[in-house]
From Swiss-Prot:
Role: It may play a role in renal development and may also be involved in the repair of the kidney after ischemia-reperfusion or folic acid administration.
UniProt-annotated location(s): Nucleus
Name of the protein in question: Zinc finger protein 354A
PROSITE patterns reported for this sequence: KRAB (PS50805), ZINC_FINGER_C2H2_1 (PS00028), ZINC_FINGER_C2H2_2 (PS50157)
Length: 572
């Protein structure tokens, strides 16, 4: 199109006033900061779109103000309506109708909630430049003819101009006529998105691209928002605080779930026994008790049956991947695959230092820190470092003293629900973690893992000072205190300090007189379990300690040590 033709058509087709949205002073005051920000975004974007099409107009003053981050009006420049755009108007009178303001308010409220754009970005317009010019030729000539036929009747023109300009604005917003709901489709899984940025973020899930790396632990993420959320684990920051009880959380979603404990009644009721729950997930888990096992089986990777009733259908939308072995459900197929390794025993992630294998890459990364000595999670109170966020969270309880979960049997307060479950097994006698080699059972999986190292001979924890190795991290920590001389456990009664917490517990029994270990044969009690075991050999006649020189047997190690002195004295 020739420049003179562009100039002619632009005078009668579309000016910046046509796409500008006006607010009065009172209306502007009612907008919250996020809505004002969205207003700036839309105005600048509309101006950019018009400028990219070559419209011959000078930059309006409102655009200059918005680009500088200022409000779109100055007090001294206010017009009678309380708002001045600072525009150079054309022949026609630009009016801010109540309908237009109301429409924008609806749009701005809707976008602030849904986080969706109104129109296509300027770069998308340039992609379809050829089609844009073709469409513009048609619309420009149509509007020009309309203008000539009505140029003697300004009122008639203004009425028709409104509908024609709306068409042009609609075209600028969506040059290809694509529906605004879902425009962009992923070529890998055919999932659709409303904008290109969402599509690009989604495509990183397929490509595995992770551009955002944590400087503390080197963990990489595909999105910057995920990195920001992860970095809170290092700083220990908990910006979301419950106003009811003061408990703090790292995520807003965690705070939202917690608030339900204060505000939401137990509205999810089991039809079988009448028990109520505060969350649907609690009811869903409880219903498995009645069902015995989940009857809706499926092939791995396929979604579970949706032919469920009542609240189960709600959960099938949230957790749709079902494990055939135990009936647990998961939100994604990848979570199901990770879980199934528990049943199959598959451990594809192997440590290059000690050869230990893991079912998940995150477990391997955490394990490797044992060898490197890296402790990226640091306590903000005392500066102590930890290899995992879970260990840091457990440590923080020392400073805060928070204990929210009480045992119904003994009243003991515990800091987490998982700790409470393990503690309750003391009362029930349940030991679900069983060693496949010797059959010995344990209350928790960590105790089983440590026990299994007795069979494998694995000692992954090494002292950097003397090179001595240990089966568990706590043994290494206790040993390292022999080098440093550190004794952090102090008795409040007498002031005596100890290098191990177990030594302090045993020492306290001297002050309290407590002897919890009782011999079943004679009823004698002892402060230590080892003392009871040694005592019971009197009844059984067991003598496990043998002298290598003369073969004599003893029931105590100390007796064997004293016996060795006889042979030492006999040597010339």
């Amino acid at each position: 199109m020739a420049p003179e033709q562009w100039e002619a058509t632009s005078q009668v087709s579309l000016t910046f006033e046509d796409v500008a949205v006006l607010f009065t002073r009172d209306e502007w005051k009612k907008l919250v900061p996020s809505q004002r920000s969205l207003y700036r975004e839309v105005m600048l974007e509309n101006y950019s779109n018009l400028a990219s099409l070559g419209f011959p107009f000078t930059k309006p003053k409102v655009i200059s103000l918005l680009q500088q981050g200022e409000d779109p009006w100055k007090v001294e420049e206010e017009g009678p309506g309380g708002f001045s755009l600072g525009l150079k108007c054309s022949q026609r009178t630009t009016k801010s109708t109540q309908t237009q303001d109301s429409s924008f308010r609806e749009l701005i409220m809707r976008k602030s909630k849904r986080k969706e754009p109104w129109n296509m970005k300027s770069e998308n317009l340039s992609i379809h430049e050829g089609k844009l010019e073709e469409k513009w030729d048609v619309n420009a000539s149509t509007i020009e003819r309309s203008y000539k036929s009505n140029e003697l009747s300004p009122k008639s023109h203004r009425e028709k101009r409104s509908s024609e300009c709306e068409k042009q604005i609609s075209y600028l917003s969506n040059p290809l006529g694509i529906t605004p709901d879902k425009r962009y489709k992923c070529s890998m899984c055919e999932k659709t998105f409303i904008n290109t940025s969402s599509l690009r973020k989604h495509e990183k899930n397929h490509s595995g691209e992770k551009l955002f790396k944590c400087k503390e632990c080197s963990k990489a993420f595909s999105q910057s928002s995920a990195l920001i959320q992860h970095q809170i684990t290092h700083t220990g920051e908990k910006p979301y605080v419950c106003k009811e009880c003061g408990k703090a959380f790292t995520l807003s979603t965690s705070l939202y779930k917690h608030l339900r404990t204060h505000t939401v009644e137990k509205s999810y009721r089991c039809k079988e026994c009448g028990k109520s729950f505060g969350r649907r997930s609690g009811l869903f888990i409880h219903q498995k008790v009645h069902a015995g096992e989940n009857p809706y089986k499926y092939n791995p990777g396929r979604k579970a049956s949706t032919s469920l009733s009542g609240c189960q259908r709600i959960h099938s939308r949230k957790k749709t991947y079902l494990c055939n072995e135990c009936g647990n459900t998961f939100k994604s197929s990848s979570s199901l695959r990770y879980h199934q390794r528990i049943h199959t025993g598959e451990k594809p992630f192997k440590c290059s230092e000690c050869g230990r294998a893991f079912s998940q890459s995150a477990s391997l990364i955490q394990h490797e820190r044992i060898h490197t000595g890296e402790k990226p999670y640091r306590c903000s109170e005392c500066g102590k470092g930890f290899t995992s966020i879970s260990r840091l969270n457990r440590h923080r309880i020392i400073h805060t003293g928070e204990k929210f979960y009480n045992c119904n049997e003994c009243g003991k307060a515990l800091s987490s629900h998982s700790t409470l479950i393990i503690h309750e097994r003391i009362h029930t006698g349940e030991k679900p973690c069983k060693c496949k080699v010797c059959g010995k059972a344990f209350r928790q999986s960590s105790a089983l893992i440590q026990h299994q190292r007795m069979h494998t001979g694995e000692r992954p924890y090494k002292c950097n000072e003397c090179g001595k190795t240990f089966r568990c991290n706590s043994s290494l920590s206790n040993h390292q205190r022999t080098h440093t001389g550190e004794k952090p456990y102090r008795c409040q009664e007498c002031g005596m300090s100890f290098g191990q917490s177990s030594a302090l517990i045993q020492h306290r029994r001297i002050h309290t007189g407590e002897k919890p270990f009782k011999c079943n044969t004679c009823g004698k009690t002892f402060r230590q379990s080892s003392s009871r075991i040694a005592h019971q050999r009197i009844h059984t006649g067991e003598k496990p300690y043998e002298c290598n020189t003369c073969g004599k047997l003893f029931n105590h190690r100390s007796s064997l040590t004293n016996h060795y002195k006889i042979h030492v004295d006999e040597d010339p």
